[in-house]
Structure formats: C-alpha cells, structure tokens
Swiss-Prot record:
Keywords: Cell adhesion, Cell membrane, Cell projection, Chemotaxis, Coiled coil, Cytoplasm, Cytoskeleton, Differentiation, Hearing, Membrane, Myogenesis, Phosphoprotein, Signal transduction inhibitor. It is found in: Cytoplasm; Cytoplasm, Cytoskeleton; Cell projection, Filopodium; Apical cell membrane. Expressed in the cochlea (at protein level). The lineage of its organism: Eukaryota, Metazoa, Chordata, Craniata, Vertebrata. This is Rho family-interacting cell polarization regulator 2.
Length: 1310
C-alpha cells in the first residue's frame, strides 16, 4: 500500500505520538509510517487533511505494512483529554501550514448512515448542473459535514488507501449550516473595494417579464436580513448607551444611531415597494382574467374595443411590475465575497471496498473527552489534491469574477484575487465553476455548482463551504458579508428612473388614502354605481326607487352629486328597488326635480362633462340627450350613470336597441347583484317594467338562480363518475346510468357557445374580473367622509381596469348597511367553474335546468353509494335499484330537453308530457314555481303554497299539525331520512321531476287526500313522542300490530325510542316490534326501511336501525351489519357488533355453538372488543419497534435503507367460511393476489432499473409463491373430488366425510 507523505510530516507525527498512545506498549511494534498515521488534528483543524505531494505526476511515499493497520485497528484505541484553544494554537505553530480553517459541526438528522455508519459529507451549498443534479439533492443551505466514530474498518488489498485518525467530540449530536457566524458582525471597511469594470453596475434596463414568485422570496429574505441587522445594531446601541457614562467620546454611538435610522428607512422603503408591487401584480392578474373572459365572449365592436383596452392596461401593469423590481433590486445592498481557499477531503464512495472489524465498539462518549477511531478513506486520484493550480469562475447575472490560484508543495494556497463585490439580483443565482490546470492546454473541469443567494441576507459574515464536485471531496470556502448600505446609485437620471419616480408618486395613493379601483377608459362594459345602492335599514320603510340611467360621459369619467339634505328615513329604506331607465325617460320624468334640487356642485359637474358634448344614438330613430345628474332631496333618490356606449353594446346584438324599457329588480328574487348583472347583460328577450306573477302564486320568486346550487355541473358529473366507475359493471342499472350520464355530459359539452345565455358569459366576465380586484375593497372607504359633492375622474386612468366611485354620504347610515358595488359584484354570480381550460362553464343555457340536473346527479351519486353498501343484501339493493332506474329515466328526459334547446320553455308539460293527465298536481306545481324557473322550486316556497292551499283543512281535522305534515311531505319527496328543519327549508330545492316521480310512484292523484293520510301518521308519531314513560308503556302494550301502520315516520319514531336511556321504554318497544314482526306485511316494510336506514349518513338513525333490527330478529341484515362493523365511528361499530352477535342464535349458522350456555351476547361482544384491542396493540407495537431502534439501516435484512410504513388493515371479508372447500378457494385467491402484487413490484423494479430488487424478489418470494399456489391448487382439486354433493334444498353448507378425512389426514400433516 502506498501513502503520499512528506518526510517532514513523519517527523512531526512522531513528536506527537507519545501524547496519544503509550509508546512503550505500541512503539516497538509499529513502523515509522504507521506511527505517523496516528496523528490527529486539532478540533478546529478537523477538515484539514494531509496533502498528497506529487512529483512529476507520480506519488512519492512509503510502504505501510498491512499488519500495522490490523494492529492499529484492534489494539490502538488511545484517548486524551481535550486541550484548550490556547494549547492548540501553540501546537499549531509547530505544524506545517495546511488548508484554510473551516469550523465543521456534524449532523445526525440528515445522516444516511446513522451513528454507527461511515458518513459522507452532506455540506452541499447549492445545486449543480444536470449531470451532478441527478445524484445530488438540491439544498440551499448545507447541513454541515458529519464525522462520527464508526466500527473499525480497513481497505482490502490492492487499493491505495490513507488511514488516519479523525477527531470526534460528540459531533454527531449537533447540527449546523455551512454559514458559519462569528461572534460579532464585521464592520464595513473604510476603504471601499475597487469593483471590476463589469461589476460596478447592474443592468440598467428593467426586465421585460416580471418574476412575482422570485420577488416574494427575495423580499422575505431581504426583510429578515434587515430585521436581523436592526436587532443586532440596536443590541449594540443599548450596550453602548449603558456604558456612556464611562466613555469620554460617543462617536461610535452616533454611528450606530445613523445605522439604526438607515435600516429603518430601508425597511419602510422595501415594505412600500413590495406593497405597490403586490397591487400591480393583482391588477395584472385581473386584467389577464378579463382578457380570457372577453376573448371567449360573443364578438361585438364594444367587446373588441374593451379587449384592446385590457391589453393596453395589462402591458402597463407588467411594465410597472418590472420597474418596481428594478427599484427593489437597488435596495438589496451588496455582497462582499472573500476567497478562503479550496479544501480537499477523502470520502468513502460507492464502489470502494471495505469491511468492518468484528467486536463491540469500546468507545463511550463522555463530555470533555476526545476519542479516535480508525477510518479507511477512499482511494486517491479523483482530484482531492490540485498540484498545478486551479481556476475559479463565478457568474452572477452579468457580473463576473475570475481568479486563478495555485497550491504549493507545502500546502499553501496563493490566489491572484481574494475579494470582490457582487450586487445582489432578484432573479439569478451565483454560478461557480472550478477547473484544474494540468498544463498549458490541458484543463480538467473539477465541478460546477449553482448556489441560492436569498440565505445570504444576514447581519453577520458567513463562511460558506460549497461542494464543487458531486462527491463533495472538493470544497470552495468563501466568506460572504452582506452590506445593506453604501451602494452607489447606478440608476441613470433618465429612462427608467423617471418612470420609477412617477410610479412611486402614483403608488403613494395606496398608502395615503382610498385605493382607486381600476377602470377601462371610455369603452367599458360596466361603470360605476354609488355605494348606497345596497343600503338597507328598517324593514317597515317603503321601497326606494333608484334611477339607473344611461348617460353620455366623456372618457368614462363619473360625476356624482350627493345631497346634503337627505332625510334619515330615506337613508334607511328597507328594500331598495333599482330601476334601469333610458336617459330620455330620466330627462322627462325628473326635470322638475332637477331644477329644484340642483346646487353649485351639480353645476360644476355639468361643466366637467363639457358643453359641446355630442349625444349618441341608441338607434337610427332615437337619440339620447346628455343628462345632468339629479338628486331627489325628499326621497333620497340618487341617479346612477352608465355610459351610453354600454347601452349600445348590450342591446345591439339582441336586436332590441330601438326600444329600451325600464326594469325593476325585485329583492324577493334574492341577490340584487345577480339580477343587476343579468338585466344588464341579458339578450334573451325584452324586459318589462312590471313584476311577473303566475296567477295564484304566493309571490314572485326566481330564488336568485344558482343560490341553491351546491356545486357546479362539472362537480356533479365528476362526483357521480367517481362513485360509479369502480362498480359500473356490477348491475345493469349502473350500466344504463353510466350511458345516460355520459350522453348528457356530451350533450352539454357539444352545445354551441351561441346557445348558452349571454348573461352567463358576461356574468363570468364580471365574476372573474371583479374577484381579482377584491383587494381594493379595503376599509379605507369608511375613513374618509366629506360633505357636499365629490367629483372623480378615474375613467381615464391608464393603470386601472375598472372604476369604482367612492361615494360619501352625509346622512346617518348604519355601518353594516354600507355596501360597495365592486364588493357586491364580487359575490358569486352563479357561474360555474371552467371545463377543459375554457373560461365558459358547462351549462344548458337555463339556470333552472342547470339546478335540476345538478340535483338529480347528486341524488344518483347518493343512490349509487347506498347500493354499493347494501350489495350483499339483495332485497335492499333491489329497492334502491328501482329508485335508480327512475332517475335514469329522468336523466334521459333532461338530456332530451337540453339537446332540443328547450331550456327556455315556460310550460311544465313540455318537459313532462304525462303531467297533463294529473291536472290537480300540475296546477299546484305551476303555483309553486316562478316563470323564470319551471324546473325547480324552493322547499320554503312549496310549503308556503301548501299552507295557502291545504292548511285550513289539515288544521281542522288535526289542529296544529299542518306545518309538520308539510315538512314531512317535503322530506319524503327529497328522500330524506327525517323531516327537514325550518331553518334549512330556504336552501333546499325540489325539482319538478322529484315532485312528479314521488307522487306517481305512491299512486297519488289527489294531493289533499295524500296529505290527510300523512297527517294521521304524523299525529300518531307526535302522540308517541309526547307521552310520558308510564303512558307510553301502557300505549305500547295496548297497541296491536295491525293498528300501527308500517309507515316511514312511525318506523323511525319506534327506532328512536329504542335509543332512550329508559330501559323500560326500550324493552316495551322491543317487545312490540318482536310481536309486530310476526305480521309478514309489517315485517317486510320495517325490514326494508331499517336496512335502508343503515345506508344513510345519519349516525343516530343508524344506531336506532341496528337496535330495531335486533328487536325484529332480522337475520337478513347480517351482511349489512358486518359491513357496518367497519365504520369509522366507534359507537356505530359497537352497536353493530352487538346486534350482529345477538342475531347469531337465530341465523342457524356455525356461529351458534351447541355447548353455548349462560354466555350472553353482551359479554361475548366485550370479549371480542378486547381481542381486537390486543390485535391492534400488537400491530402498533410492531411500528413502535422500528421507532425505538435509532436507525433503520441497522436492522437485520434492511439492505437498502428503506422504512416500514404501515397502513390500515381491514378485517377479513367474512367471519364464517362454511366448509373446507370454500375456505381453500378463499386461501388460493388470497395467494394469487399476493403473487400478483409481487409480480407488479418486480415489474416496477425492472422498469426503474433496480436489479437488486428484482433478484431479491426472484430468489426469496416468487419461486416460493409459485410452489405454494401449485400445492394449494392440488389440494383444491382433491377437495372437489372427495366432497359430497350439496343438497339443493338447504342453504347451509354441509361438510362431507371426504372433507373431514382430508382435513385430518392431509392438511394436518402438510
């Protein structure tokens, strides 16, 4: 073995040998070279290693006898007390100069080898190029170099190795970064470094594309650095202030004061810039969404003009962001980088061969003592020592630093440049490349790496150890100091500087007052409305009409005049009524009011509009005179203005621009914003002034469209497909449902864009745009209140997308009643999410039809889940499948309606032709639904109509039961497990198909007759619920099973009585159900209802159903109870288990033992719970076993460094296996599944080029699995031969004599 050593090193090593090892015991047995290998390093010299002296390219060294290495590894285990730093520094003078000093602290958390393994360096300070990135993890901050004592190892013969002792002082329990902090922050040198010609400035051109994510990262890092700087200097300032009395001069104190003020100034400036940047970023996002929405909306002249304006605004926001980035970059300070040298380290690498020495590790870590272990390092020759020299090239944006260095024979390094300055950049990383110089034309790339810079913003200098090559054997040591000040202003006086200053002046608006809402200029689709449109006060006040007129405003500027004499009563109107009228109507109807109420401010408003403003025509025959704003001082009516071009844009495509009629927005219809957007953008038909009432209806109600919609059409389709896909081949009904749903989805996706309502398209524009500007609706609107008139000219602003007028009121207004149009328009307008990347939602063009489809899709999803849960109980699944079949027919009708473009039908008969055969039911539904939505009605509205039509008759026969009866009917129509609460009626929707399907399936032709029957059930239920315990017991004992109908409400009440704490009541109900179960009709209906209740999500009802099935002795429900035993709720699992055990004696199964006596089911259930607890505890202890071992790598058999991660384990699919043949079939299927999983893992390992895994599976598992499957197959064949014939008339498996002999004679000895 060869080791490159200098003769002077051997002499020095021999001098220290007596300090660490007893020379009298070891000295005579070691050669001089082996003696030299015992020399360690001082603690702060840990990373320094002996240089390899090369002479003419060949290693000059001496032989190291193998026996010396073996003897050292087993015998020499010296230990010494650690010396203080002063002694170390004295000893350092007698040693030759080595590589630069780097403090290194170990890390255990990132150690791949563990405390007992040989650990490589993990001090990666960056990420390298593509070739090295494949085998190295990307780390911004290095976790440090780890050296820990390990088992004694040595190299096998044939490899040139170095053997050394490494100092370890319990380093493996510590953690550090590669950024080493000194005790105090270095002060900026007085003489500024001379920057290189290409380093003294940065790119003066602002970036073309903003980088928001990177700006946020750098902002956070810069802010943390400034905070740290401020904290450090304030600490020193407080220290000097305390010592001020003892000081004659306080000049240093003044310097700290200046630094403190400078840091605070920079912090404020950085925060202001970042806030402005965030605003511009959000404006850019909003403009981007507007571009998408307008690009997909129907083409028109106004739309094209608006799109052009959006593009201009988007470009300006982008330029503003780039300008702010450049300004922020100038506040980043500077990085002072000092070259500390290159360090080479030897490492154990993949491919090196070594073996561990047997025997326990004799070392024990104790505080204050130093131990040594023998470590065999990797072979030499990979660039660990650079003989000729090295060239380092650093690149940071457009900044460059090239330096050349040489490593002398004695290990001293000399570099032609030791320090430089880099100006930090927002975008970009520091790229470092190191090249070894072999000759004049021979250069070898040692490695290259790219380093993150955001961690360098720190108050104290940091020493960074950068791994240059992939193995970490070459490190570049740099000392980086960040100075946040003294950066010359390199921004030129012209160009971007002026724009930055102007931008800062504009951004000051955001910090000093109310933020301006973005606007389009004169061609926008939506203009401003005053804040108090949505004001509401006392409900007793009358509706206040607000006139919304189209007026001709130049450049989109809005002028609003507020009356100082507004009455308080008008300010608190309860239900504002918004009327949209053309300008000529406003002029004719309000001219007298204008004359009496106009003041000087309104006159100035007229002047601001321009005297020679030309009117624009709505059509060829009609012209609109420019109108003045008007205020009605008596009623508080305020005129709202929209641009005339908006009116043209909204009416041109509907061919109704010649006749514009006023419209009232009704507060009964729900959200006023949705109505406003719908009216402003609707092109479906003419709009009338009067409210539309259906004859005989309780009130006009469209329910604000999608306010009832729980999710969009896309969500409903996705949810149903997700529930249906795994089981769609299980039943024919599932296949039919999948076919119809797919057809309906295709119909909606294939509908042309023109068939979709324009209101939906443009409402999406409002939604997607105004939601982007939510951040502008701050509380600043409440901070500034002025009397008189306010004139705003924001329409012409080039840096905004929409404009919102800031309206101030002089009257007393309730704070919660104050609203802002942009905030109101930001609410959900009912437009769904996009599909397939398109901003247009999936829709039929009719909101009522959309709601109907969503409700039926959601109900189908619920039915599919219930059918899957009850699939092992045929009679329950059959009942649910019948319901699903009816829903398939409904979806078929919905697809036909959507495909034939009948979304705007106004008659229910067109959707359900069979409805004309039941005129009473049809007449009642037409009273419940509104003309805008014939497909659905709210539950609250339906109940109101029921009360208006049938409440008198119901209360006459059953006083006070009308409302419970109506709520029970609604819950049955919706197929709910229990009656709806009064609070939830307003959010529930009933579709016309649900209404018709329920009544026809129950044979109802007259609604009043059905309500009378339902009232009798409700009366009986309330009687049972209201009785005291004694009376209830008497009633239950007197009731005959034939006198109590097996209806849903009665059955539910009886089951809930079983959950009472009173044992006597529970026992009485149990006895009644047991007696009633003898009635076949009652038992059939009760069994079906309670089994279906097990599939519901109501936990209380599930528990009650279990107890009821227990009372009915319903063995038919055993399989459903077994499934319920796997519930996530402990209480349900317990009740289901007890019910299952109680049904065992009646099932005639093998669970009933003939020796069972005095062994209650409750005790058996408790024993089973204990058994399962022990089983889970053993599973948990298995996991804890891996935790208590400190390192998984040390586990026997874990050759790859993996981890054991446990998953939930389900119970076996059945508790009884019947006869031996069935059990063997189940075992064979289990082994086949296991073998298939092994084959899949083998295929994955082969695809990932993992030969070790493939070989491991082939040699240990796959061969054994094949043999086992073969043997089980043979047993199964023999079992089928010896098993006797199964009697056809019995449903219980009977074991034959052949099976018995096979078990005893064959399986017992196998």
């Amino acid at each position: 073995m060869q080791h490159c050593l200098e003769q002077s090193d051997i002499t020095q090593y021999q001098q220290y040998y007596s300090s660490w090892c007893d020379a009298r015991a070891l000295g005579p047995r070691l050669s001089p070279v082996a003696l030299s290998l015992l020399v360690g390093r001082n603690e702060h010299r840990l990373s320094a290693e002996p240089e390899v002296h090369r002479s003419q390219g060949r290693c000059v060294g001496v032989e190291v006898p193998r026996e010396d290495i073996n003897y050292l590894s087993t015998t020499c285990k010296p230990e010494i007390k650690s010396r203080n730093l002063k002694e170390d520094s004295e000893d350092q003078g007698r040693l030759p100069t080595r590589l630069p000093e780097i403090m290194l602290v170990g890390s255990q958390s990132f150690s791949p080898g563990g405390p007992n393994g040989i650990i490589r360096s993990q001090s990666f300070a960056g990420f390298s190029g593509l070739q090295e990135r494949r085998s190295r993890q990307v780390l911004g901050v290095s976790p440090g170099i780890t050296r820990a004592p390990s088992k004694d190892v040595y190299c096998k013969p044939g490899y040139a190795c170095r053997v050394e002792f490494l100092l370890c002082k319990a380093f493996s329990k510590q953690t550090c970064n590669s950024f080493i902090e000194n005790a105090s922050a270095l002060k900026k040198p007085q003489a500024k470094l001379k920057k290189m010609h290409n380093l003294g400035h940065k790119n003066t051109n602002t970036p073309k594309e903003p980088q928001p994510k990177r700006v946020e990262e750098v902002y956070r890092a810069l802010k943390n650095g400034l905070d740290e700087y401020l904290e450090f200097h304030q600490t020193e300032l407080d220290k000097l202030t305390a010592q001020l009395k003892d000081m004659k001069r306080n000049s240093r104190l003044g310097v700290l004061y200046d630094l403190d003020k400078g840091v605070l100034y920079d912090l404020d400036k950085v925060d202001e810039l970042y806030e402005a940047y965030c605003i511009q970023r959000r404006l850019q996002d909003g403009a981007s969404k507007m571009k998408q929405a307008f690009a997909t909306s129907p083409a028109s002249k106004a739309a094209r003009e608006s799109l052009s304006e959006i593009n201009r605004s988007y470009k300006e926001y982008t330029e503003n962001m780039c300008t702010i980035e450049a300004e922020l970059e100038s506040l980043l300070g500077e990085f002072s980088i000092k070259m500390k040298g290159l360090a080479g380290f030897a490492r154990l690498c993949p491919g090196d061969q070594y073996e561990s020495m047997d025997g326990p590790n004799p070392y024990q870590r104790q505080q204050g003592e130093v131990y040594f272990s023998l470590l065999a390092t990797r072979r030499i020759g990979d660039g660990s020592c650079l003989s000729k020299g090295a060239r380092i090239f650093m690149k940071y944006g457009r900044q460059r630093w090239k330096l050349k260095g040489k490593i002398e024979v004695n290990g001293k390094q000399s570099w032609d440049g030791e320090e430089t300055v880099f100006l930090p950049l927002i975008v970009g990383f520091i790229s470092i490349k190191v090249t070894e110089l072999k000759g004049l034309a021979t250069h070898i790339l040692v490695g290259s790496v790219t380093c993150e810079t955001k961690e360098l913003f720190a108050a104290r200098p940091q020493v960074v150890a950068v791994d240059i090559n992939d193995l970490g054997t070459i490190k570049l040591n740099l000392e980086i100091t960040w100075y946040p000040f003294d950066v010359e202003d390199t921004t030129p006086s012209s160009g971007p500087g002026n724009k930055t200053a102007a931008l800062q002046r504009r951004m000051s608006m955001y910090s000093q007052g109310t933020p301006e809402t973005p606007t389009f200029k004169d061609q926008s689709f939506f203009s401003n409305l005053p804040d108090d449109i949505f004001e509401s006060g006392n409900a007793a006040e009358e509706k206040r009409p607000l006139s919304l007129s189209f007026s001709d405003l130049q450049d989109g500027d809005c002028v609003f005049t507020s009356s100082s004499t507004t009455s308080p009563s008008s300010s608190h109107s309860a239900h504002p009524e918004i009327t949209i009228t053309p300008a000529e109507l406003t002029h004719s109807s309000l001219s007298s009011q204008n004359e009496g109420t106009e003041d000087s401010s309104s006159a100035s408003s007229r002047n601001s509009l321009g005297e020679d403003h030309e009117p624009k025509s709505h059509s060829k025959s009609d012209t609109v005179e420019p109108k003045k704003p008007s205020v009605d001082a008596r009623s508080g009516t305020e005129s709202l203005f929209l641009e005339n071009s908006v009116a043209e844009a909204l009416l041109q495509e509907s061919d109704e621009a010649s006749e514009l009629k006023p419209v009232e927005l009704d507060t009964f219809e729900g959200n006023i914003t949705k109505q406003l957007v719908k009216r402003l953008t609707s092109a479906e038909g003419p709009i009338t002034t009067n409210k539309l009432f259906f004859e005989g209806s309780v009130g006009s109600e469209s329910e604000a469209g999608r306010s009832f919609l729980d999710g969009s059409l896309e969500d409903a389709f996705n949810g149903l497909f997700l529930a249906l896909d795994p089981h769609k081949e299980q039943y024919k009904e599932f296949q039919d449902l999948n076919q119809e749903v797919t057809h309906l989805d295709d119909v909606l996706k294939c509908k042309p864009a023109g068939s979709r309502s324009r209101s939906s398209s443009l409402s999406l524009t409002v939604e997607s745009a105004l939601e982007s500007f939510d951040f502008l609706n701050t509380s600043d609107f409440d901070e500034e209140e002025e009397d008189g008139d306010e004139v705003c000219h924001v329409g012409g602003g080039a840096d905004s997308v929409f404009s919102d007028t800031e309206t101030e009121k002089s009257g007393s207004v309730h704070p919660e009643a104050r609203g802002h149009l942009s905030e109101a328009l930001t609410e959900d307008t009912g437009v769904g999410t996009s599909v397939a990347g398109s901003p247009l939602p999936l829709t039929t063009g009719n909101e009522s039809l959309d709601i109907t489809i969503v409700k039926h899709l959601q109900y189908c999803t619920q039915l599919v889940q219930q059918i899957v849960f009850s699939s092992k109980t045929p009679f329950v699944a059959r009942s649910l499948l019948e319901k699903l079949s009816r829903q398939v027919l409904v979806l078929q009708k919905l697809a036909a309606v959507s495909d034939e473009n009948l979304g705007n039908i106004t008659s229910v008969v067109e959707a359900i032709p069979e409805f004309h055969k039941k005129p009473s039911l049809l007449s009642f539904w037409t009273k419940c639904c509104s003309p805008s939505g014939v497909y659905h009605s709210s539950a609250a509205h339906l109940i109101k109509q029921l009360e208006a039509s049938f409440a008198r008759n119901i209360n006459k026969d059953y006083p006070g039961l009308a409302e419970p009866v109506f709520r029970t009917l609604v819950s049955q129509i919706l197929d709910r497990a229990e009656p709806l609460l009064c609070s939830g009626l307003s959010s529930e929707v009933i579709t016309v198909f649900q209404y018709y399907s329920f009544l026809t399936s129950h044979g109802v032709s007259d609604l009043e007759t059905h309500l009378g029957q339902l009232a009798r059930q409700v009366a009986m239920v309330q009687t049972l619920q209201s009785l005291r315990d004694e009376k209830l017991l008497q009633t239950m004992s007197d009731l005959a099973p034939s006198n109590l109908p097996a209806q849903q409400e009665v059955l539910r009440t009886l089951a809930l009585l079983l959950t009472k704490d009173d044992n006597e009541v529970s026992e009485a109900v149990t006895l009644y159900l047991a007696a009633a179960s003898k009635n076949e009709h009652f038992r059939e209906k009760a069994l079906l209802y309670y089994c279906e209740a097990l599939t519901k999500t109501n936990l209380q009802l599930q528990k009650a159903a279990c107890l009821a099935l227990k009372s009915l002795e319903a063995t038919e429900s055993i399989k459903m109870l077994v499934t319920l035993c796997q519930s996530d709720t402990e209480e349900i699992r317990t009740v289901a288990s007890e019910t299952l055990l109680s049904l065992a004696p009646y099932s005639g199964s093998a669970m009933t033992s003939q020796i069972r006596q005095n062994y209650s089911t409750e005790v058996e259930a408790a024993v089973n719970r204990l058994v399962n607890l022990h089983l889970r505890a053993s599973y948990t202890y298995l996991s804890l076993g891996f935790f208590f071992d400190p390192d998984d790598v040390a586990l026997e058999g874990n050759e790859r460094g993996g981890r054991a991660l446990f998953q939930d384990v389900q119970k076996p699919s059945q508790d009884e296996w019947g006869k031996t043949l069935e059990a063997m079939e189940a075992a064979l299927a289990l082994e086949k599944n296991l073998n298939q999983a092994l084959l899949d893992l083998h295929a994955l390992g082969s695809a990932r080029t993992d030969p070790h895994l493939c070989d491991f599976l082939e040699s240990h598992f796959l061969d054994k699995e094949v043999k086992l499957i073969k043997k089980m197959g043979n047993h199964l064949t023999n079992l089928r031969r010896v098993a006797g014939p199964q009697p056809a008339q019995t449903g219980v498996a009977q074991a034959s004599l052949g099976e018995y002999l096979f078990e005893r004679l064959t399986l017992k000895h196998d």
